[in-house]
A protein has these predicted regions:
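Hydrophobic/aromatic beta-strand patches that form the interior of the parallel beta-sheet core
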Residues: 4, 31-33, 92-94, 149-153, ...
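Conserved catalytic-core segment of NTP-binding enzymes
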Residues: 112-117, 121-202
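P-loop/Walker-type NTP enzyme "switch/lid" segment
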Residues: 7, 35-119
Length: 204
């Protein structure tokens, strides 16, 4: 498995927490990419408690790629280590955007970045992408088409499931655009609906 893409239809709790928890417990070396177009630097300010100076992150990579830099080397050099309990694995973070609007500047850089992620996967390093909420702008097609797994993160409350229902066409479009597996990641199942009930309702 190489690229694991996580997104949310909106109103779902814990997308970034889910991505971080997955990275910290992942069985292989892994890079967590913050690709949320509405930046919050939650991991840097929360999990890392602001101990590491800000990095240019994704927008810095876009600039470097346009200047002809090697995608894999540049991506790796831009990551920072994430503390974790298992000393025999590498867990690293690629910081996201510095402010609103920067996501629109990535353009063709996503193709180079997705290729770099595939190359890392072949070298034994998986990539987990926190893509933020589904919104007016579609997720980068280069990521969607090359993802091994796309997880749609949702809660099990009625309001959260309503958000999932409203984004059904976008989820279906992603399913058609990838050869990877697309599935639901339910945060807090059984509150009140369990995973089976949610899956049954979402596939109608």
């Amino acid at each position: 498995m190489s690229i694991i893409l996580l997104t949310s239809p909106g109103g779902a709790p814990g997308l970034t927490t889910t991505a971080l928890g997955l990275a910290l417990t992942w069985p292989r070396d892994v890079v967590l990419v913050d690709a949320d177009p509405c930046p919050g630097h939650v991991i840097e300010s929360g999990y890392l408690t602001g101990r590491i100076p800000p990095r240019p992150g994704l927008i810095g990579l876009a600039t470097a790629f346009r200047d002809g830099a090697d995608p894999v080397q540049t991506m790796w050099e831009e990551t920072i280590p994430l503390p974790h309990d298992s000393g025999d694995r590498m867990v690293r973070l690629l910081s996201g955007y510095g402010h609103l609007g920067q996501a629109s500047l990535m353009g063709a850089a996503w193709s180079s970045l997705a290729s770099a992620m595939i190359d890392l996967g072949q070298a034994g390093v998986d990539v987990i992408v926190d893509a933020g909420r589904l919104g007016p702008e579609a997720l980068p097609s280069s990521l969607v088409s090359r993802a091994s797994l796309i997880g749609i993160v949702t809660g099990s409350r009625l309001r959260q499931l309503a958000g999932l229902s409203m984004r059904a066409e976008e989820v279906e479009a992603m399913s058609s655009a990838t050869t990877g597996t697309v599935g639901l990641v339910v945060v807090g199942p059984g509150r009140p609906y369990n995973s089976r009930e949610i899956d049954r309702k979402s596939t109608r």
